[in-house]
C-alpha cells in the first residue's frame, strides 16, 4: 500500500512535472473529489477574459446592464452544463478528452478534433498574452500598440519558459489565483461603484434588440464552449466511482458564479465612459477612473495570472500533439504553441482591433465545438455499447456545415473588407444580426446522430 501511495504522489504533485501522458490514469493514482472541479474551472474563469467578454454586450452590442446580465447568465449556464456533462468522460475512462473520442470518431477521425483543439489552445494562448500585455501597458500609460506588442513577446517567452509542470500544479495555481483575483476585483468594483450607471438600458430597440440579445447570449456561450475539448483533461484523475451528478454540477458552479459576478462588473464598466471603452477597451476605463492603489495591483495580477493561465493551453496542446502521434517533447510542444500563439497575438495587436479579433476567435469556435460535443455526449450517455465512427463523424460534419448558413459573417469579417456582402445576408438581416450557428450546430448534429443510431437498430 505504501508503494501505491508513493506512486500516486510521484505521478501528480504540485511543482513537479506530471509523469503521465495520454494513457489512462490507473485506479491507484486517482484522487480528489468532484468539487475540486469547481475551483479549477473557477480559476479558468475568474479572470479578465470573463469581464471583457461581458463588457462587449454594453460596449458594442447595445444591450443594457440588466438584460445584458440575463444574456450572460443564460449563455454561460447553457454552455457550462454541456462542459460539466463532458467532464464525466474523465473519471469513467481516465483519458484526456481527445483521446477518449477515439472510441467515438475512430482513431483517424479523432485527428480532426485534435487538430482543431490545437487551434483552440493556440488561440487561447494568444488571447491570454494580449490580455496580459494590455494590462501591463496600462502601467505605462497604455494606448501604444508597439509597447503592447513588445510586452506580448516578453509574456509569450515567459509563458513558454514556465510551461513545464502538470495537472496538480495547474489545479493549485488556478484555485489560489482565483481567490486572489476575486479579492482584487471586489476591491476595484467597490472603488468604482459610485461611478457606475446601474440603470443604463439598451440602446437598440424592437427586432434589433432581440438580435443583440441572442448575439450576447451566443458570445458568452462561445467563451465556455471553447473549453469543451479540454473537459476531461482536468477530470481524469478523479476516482471512477465519482457521482455523475457531482461531476456535472461542480464545473457549472465553478464557471457560472465567476462569469455572472465578473460579467456584471464588465457590463457596468462601459457605463462610466462609453467612448473610452469603445475606443481603447475597459482596461483604459479602469486606468483612467480607478484609484491607483487598487488599479496597479489589479493590472499586475492580470499579467501574472494570464501567464500561468497559459499553461492550461500548453498542457492541453501537449496532450493533443501526443494524441495525433506527433513525437514531440513537452518543451517542443510549448515552443510550437508559443510561436503560433505569438503570431496570432501579433496580428491582433498590430493589424486588427483586439475586440474584433477576439470575437472572431470565439465565433470560429462555434463552427465545430458544439456539434462535436453533441455527438460525444450522445455516444457516452446513450449509445455507449457500440461505436459508429463513420456516423459520428458524419453527424459532426453535418452539424458544422449546417451552422455555416447561420453565421453572421459581417460581424466576423467586417473588419477585413469594406462593405462586405455574404451569401446569407438576407437571412442574417431577417434575424436582425443574431447568430444562431452554435444552436443549429448542436441541433443538427444531435438529430443526425440520433436518427442514424435508431435507424441502425431497426
Regions found by a protein language model. Give the residues of each.
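Transmembrane helix-loop boundary segments of multi-pass membrane transporters
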Residues: 58-70, 138-150, 168-177, 283-292, ...
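C-terminal membrane-solvent junction of multi-pass transporters and transport-like membrane proteins
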Residues: 372-451
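Hydrophobic, small-residue-rich membrane helices and short re-entrant helix-turn-helix hairpins
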Residues: 30-34, 165-178, 229-261, 276-285, ...
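Membrane-interface "cap" regions at the ends of multi-pass membrane proteins
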Residues: 1-67, 212-217, 236-246, 456
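Juxtamembrane transmembrane-helix boundary signature
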Residues: 71-105, 114-120, 126
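Hydrophobic, membrane-embedded alpha-helices of multi-pass small-molecule transporters
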Residues: 34-51, 189-195, 204-269, 292-311, ...
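Transmembrane alpha-helical segments of multi-pass small-molecule transport proteins
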Residues: 114-118, 141-165, 179-190, 220-231, ...
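Membrane-water interface regions at transmembrane-helix termini and the short interhelical loops
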Residues: 59-63, 88, 104, 112, ...
